[in-house]
Amino acid sequence: MEMFTFLLTCIFLPLLRGHSLFTCEPITVPRCMKMAYNMTFFPNLMGHYDQSIAAVEMEHFLPLANLECSPNIETFLCKAFVPTCIEQIHVVPPCRKLCEKVYSDCKKLIDTFGIRWPEELECDRLQYCDETVPVTFDPHTEFLGPQKKTEQVQRDIGFWCPRHLKTSGGQGYKFLGIDQCAPPCPNMYFKSDELEFAKSFIGTVSIFCLCATLFTFLTFLIDVRRFRYPERPIIYYSVCYSIVSLMYFIGFLLGDSTACNKADEKLELGDTVVLGSQNKACTVLFMLLYFFTMAGTVWWVILTITWFLAAGRKWSCEAIEQKAVWFHAVAWGTPGFLTVMLLAMNKVEGDNISGVCFVGLYDLDASRYFVLLPLCLCVFVGLSLLLAGIISLNHVRQVIQHDGRNQEKLKKFMIRIGVFSGLYLVPLVTLLGCYVYEQVNRITWEITWVSDHCRQYHIPCPYQAKAKARPELALFMIKYLMTLIVGISAVFWVGSKKTCTEWAGFFKRNRKRDPISESRRVLQESCEFFLKHNSKVKHKKKHYKPSSHKLKVISKSMGTSTGATANHGTSAVAITSHDYLGQETLTEIQTSPETSMREVKADGASTPRLREQDCGEPASPAASISRLSGEQVDGKGQAGSVSESARSEGRISPKSDITDTGLAQSNNLQVPSSSEPSSLKGSTSLLVHPVSGVRKEQGGGCHSDT
């Protein structure tokens, strides 16, 4: 007998795991410590040999207890997992009647949560027990019958986070009001093919907007002095939206790698959206995107302020520029302050449609106070100042209505302001409409999503009377389009003929040759043109009258200063007055805009000196041929009158050296050096002096018209 007792002890002692041999023990499970009994016995019906194990297994049924699907659910669970122990080894299991009542009340929630009902707790296996252990029932349930049961199950119990969407503690995740829960990734509203189309669309629009805004900024760099206040904020505004476009393009390239967390099979976690500032890449994208989005809007408001100061308050450009420090402080300081606040509040959210990170994508309060409210405020202030400025400009236009030229310029300026403002305000107001529509319908969309996936995720399905509503993909595409296309309005302001001229000049300067050789080439081409022109006239004109008018063409090559002063001379070319210069010829010989006005004023004084130089040095080929043709027509007897005419004009003409020298030097074009240095950039000025020789029979003198 003693041997048998010893064997039983050896068999059952390892199973007791520290418990007293067949004795009751105090209840340590917190949820069951409020029961009418305080002692329990282990192992229980499910074979648990420790209260800690029983407490862990009991957690699978906690949704039923938390939702109170039955008034006796707590009593039944505690009696099943932590049974009652009376008088040492007398264990009281749950009764069959209690099991049937609880199971019938909670059957729908058991199916909803996918809870596996243990075989040991099947009501058929339990025994009917006496009334020594009271079973509490809800009197309303007994009175109302099955109607009350249906009402209890169908009441709205809120959102329960699915197991694969739960996150580890300490990250600050919150989804649909539930802590440590994250939205699913990819997007919870759209299918995979719709998401691919939306991402391609956003990437294409971002490239187009990036090119447009960069064109505006590069135009500013070509000629910085062109864009002064009040127009200067347009440049900063375009820079901001170029960064915004760049962020969306980077998000398009990255896909979901930054906006989503990868699934963890070990922890049974699925792909979820990044929430909070723990992800560094997502945080950087958020900071740049939100900061420059708000900064671009503030710079537009500052642009309307500068326009109002210039048009309404009649401030000068210099006066407005003095306030530039304050403009920069507000434009960069306000978005920076809002960005820091959002980082401190841990409001960073991944966007699994565009691939970037922003704010207010799942948090309605953050979207309302940090996106919608600032944009509405900027639109209101900017539109008010813009209307005030346009009214002031219209008043000025009425005052100067007698000045047609200035009135036309002012009218064009007002049209530019109106079109530019419309190109900015229409997309921005549309964007605000998208945000407002999303604010109103977001809750309905979320309830619909929970209702569609509750059985798949084994979570409670919401009870609702409203019709289901799902968002349209077109709404989100319009929102992204309006966000990006706002920056394109700056292209309209810089898009003018002057901008094309500046870009053409920029590329031309990059390919420009040596300025000195360039000026010489222009001079040589001009002289060759006159030489060819006069040779044609020589064959056509057989009769020459000495009284015919002549044009004295003086070509002066202006060099370019490249560290040392470059001096170039002048050459004189005589053309008969019969050789009429057409519009194209005048265009070719027209002086450059950089010609010094001092030479034009000193034209009368410099002409005699140039003529003396022309007579004292070898003549140009065109001049020699012109004079030679004149002598052949008039004969040797008229040479004296020509020389007398030359003396009356203040120059000395050689008699016999003209022909010889001209023929000898016909192949050499010599340009005498000018006494006045020039620093103009490769320009060639051609000064045309009409000289009329009116022959008088008696005096043989010459009358000159200059």
Curated annotation (Swiss-Prot):
The gene is FZD6. It is linked to Nail disorder, non-syndromic congenital, 1: An autosomal recessive nail disorder characterized by a variable degree of onychauxis (thick nails), hyponychia, and onycholysis of all nails, with claw-shaped fingernails in some individuals. No other anomalies of ectodermal tissues, including hair, teeth, sweat glands, or skin, are noted, and individuals with dysplastic nails have normal hearing and normal psychomotor development. A motif (Lys-Thr-X-X-X-Trp motif, mediates interaction with the PDZ domain of Dvl family members) lies at residues 498-503. It comes from Homo sapiens. Its main location: membrane. Disulfide bonds join 24-85, 32-78, 69-106, 95-129, 99-123. This is Frizzled-6. Residues 588-706 are annotated as: Disordered. Residues 1-18 form the signal peptide. Belongs to the G-protein coupled receptor Fz/Smo family. Residues 19-201, 255-284, 346-370, 438-473 are extracellular. One of its GO terms (cellular component) is ciliary basal body. The modification Phosphoserine is found at residue 653.
